[in-house]
């Protein structure tokens, strides 16, 4: 099946801020890494994006007044109808450049384009507009 890596999906639905350059401060209390003392650290990548999106979906469920269930059908309908809150990402790529043994290497990635693409999925979201739209669409 296309898009499946092993037993899991390998393609995006939505993109969120995952850059470690804009990481979020988080307080840990020995939850993930028992050998580390409690304290502040940073979260980025999926460790930031997944809970951020989950929180936004929770706000939509709260606004709807009930659980939303599987939101993918609503998400794809919202994107297809250009609903407020779903923002198409049309520029950028995820190519990666690094140096090793004095040589520069470029690992080509995917490029953003109008509509669905393999770098940002349907795009990103504007939470203030997305929450009420998802509450209606998944209702």
Language model feature labels by segment:
Residues 1-139:
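Extracellular protease catalytic domains of secreted zymogens
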